[in-house]
């Protein structure tokens, strides 16, 4: 589906276009009492979006669906509503990320391909932060920590004068390592459960 939406974006606007309010972009990329506005925005999302969602019935239902949709259905979990809310929140947060990227570039004339590099990085960040690709585990705090780790890796590549072209290779290696650790943990749990059968 990502490729479909990418194609639609290119069809709607093959050439960059648009503008952004300079003063607003300046504010969103500035600091308040030496704290970056972007960091305040992350804290606001965690406090006012993630924590209420995590403690709500539909939030817990999303975790149950991630662990086992069939078991969640048999337990009477409202699967359809939980999925709709999860996807709506994902779209809302992706829109905020897109706006922040627009503010960072000080231009609404961004190309459709501008955010393509963030796809792998965002997946790597949440996996490093403890979110399981198999579902049922993860947190906003862990994902933020994973994003800081990814940013640190990127900065270290610059410090050690490594070719930026090789950055996706290192990101891929980190992601592979993180996924492998998660898979090993699940394999250990499965083996322990098999012992009691």
Positions of predicted regions on the chain:
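Membrane-helix/interface signature in polytopic inner-membrane proteins
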Residues: 48-88
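Transmembrane alpha-helices
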Residues: 78-103, 120
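Alpha-helical transmembrane segments of integral membrane proteins
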Residues: 37-41, 82-89, 141-142, 167-170
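Short amphipathic alpha-helical coupling elements at transmembrane boundaries
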Residues: 25-30, 61-64, 70-74, 155-158
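Cytosolic-side transmembrane-helix boundaries in multi-pass membrane proteins
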Residues: 47-48, 74, 78-81, 104, ...
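Transmembrane alpha-helical segments in multi-pass inner-membrane proteins
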Residues: 94, 109-171
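Hydrophobic core segments of alpha-helical transmembrane domains in multi-pass membrane transport
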Residues: 2-10, 41-51, 87-98, 128-131, ...
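Transmembrane helix-bundle core of multi-pass membrane transporters
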Residues: 1-56, 82-85, 104-115, 162, ...
